[in-house]
Amino acid sequence: MENKKQSCLNVKIMTLAIFALGILFAYYTPAIAADKDQAQGLVDRARVTLNEFIRDPNYSWVRENLNHVKGILIFPQIIKGGFIFGASGGTGVLLVRDEKTGNWSEPAFYSIGSVTFGLQAGGEAAEVVMLAWTQKAIDSLLSSSFKLGADASIAIGPVGAGAKAGADIPSVTADFISFSKSKGLYAGLNLEGAVVAVRGGLNSAYCGKDARPADIIVKNDCSNRGSDELQRTLKKAGS
């Protein structure tokens, strides 16, 4: 009799466990799908942003120096006052260049946030491109988060007429060079003090498995055809 009761109890426990797992899976699966859609949307918007920079003669320095950089961070939209307490931020992608082949890695996903962003053009949002100029820049991006200006140096890149005067590559000493525009105009966004952090959920969703930045940009252990156009755009622009 005791064995029968124990057997019934075990069945009930198993049933409850399966039910609980079913609920968890029901909530978890849409979350993964949503992250994957968000990640692909960011990649697509990053390509649009990149094209806007490399086609704009005022930002010729970006295009002309893509074959010198270690990597590139593209933030399709940094929103001023878009977060609690009026802080600003956005999410973007990092791609790293293979210096031997000129090919670009799959994208890794990052957020950027600060309470001090100021948009000189008066806009509420800006598109931002950050060129990772040194190995220290890449090493910083392999950590879970870091602060621009403290853990890695950053400078605003030359724009317009200043692009020619600032084109002397040996004079570049910053780890990151940033460029920003708002509604097609120069935004002059100062990113010093901003915190850049890994978006682990988006990385894993885009790669279809648990993936850290090192897995994506160092080990090349990630493959997604959704980034093909962005990679081709970068390689063509830098050739």
Model region roles, listed by residue range:
Residues 25-33:
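Sec/Tat signal peptide C-region and signal peptidase I cleavage site
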Residues 4-6, 24, 61:
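A general, composition-driven signal for non-globular sequence regions
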Residues 15-26:
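Bacterial N-terminal signal peptides
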Residues 34-239:
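Small-residue-enriched, tightly packed secondary-structure blocks
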Residues 2-17:
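Bacterial N-terminal signal peptides that target proteins for export
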